[in-house]
Swiss-Prot record:
GO terms for cellular component: chromosome; cytosol. The keyword Nucleus does not apply. GO terms for molecular function: DNA binding; structural constituent of chromatin. Residues 56-95 are annotated as: Disordered. SMART domains: BHL (SM00411). Residues 72-95 have a biased composition (Basic and acidic residues). This protein is one of the two subunits of integration host factor, a specific DNA-binding protein that functions in genetic recombination as well as in transcriptional and translational control. It holds the Pfam family Bac_DNA_binding. It comes from Pseudoalteromonas translucida (strain TAC 125). It comes from the Bacteria. Belongs to the bacterial histone-like protein family. This is Integration host factor subunit beta.
Length: 95
């Protein structure tokens, strides 16, 4: 599901709310989450999961076109850990 599909689905489920308001709400939620992560804050949504940053150490990579080795810097990457309720719900629907 893309962001625009999410906005469309929410707008259909809440027909009394203007689509522009739904779009602004979704964008604001995502912006707040991105801001929290960029400040190294952990985000926990009970029953859904948590977002945090994981550090990837520097490493030697390879350019796939030339085969040349390249030194890659260490960096922080967003990580999502699903909560138990989400894991259970997904497993029930797939099984």
């Amino acid at each position: 599901m893309t962001k625009s599909e999410l906005i469309e689905t929410l707008a259909q489920q809440h027909a009394h709310v203007p689509v522009k308001d739904v779009e602004n709400a979704v964008k604001e939620i995502l912006e707040q989450m991105a801001g929290s992560l960029s400040s190294s804050d952990r985000i926990e949504i009970r029953g859904f999961g948590s977002f945090s940053l994981h550090y990837r150490a520097p490493r030697t990579g390879r350019n796939p076109k030339t085969g040349e080795t390249v030194e890659l810097d260490g960096k922080h990457v967003p990580h999502f850990k699903p909560g138990k309720e989400l894991r259970d719900r997904v497993n029930e629907s797939i099984a």
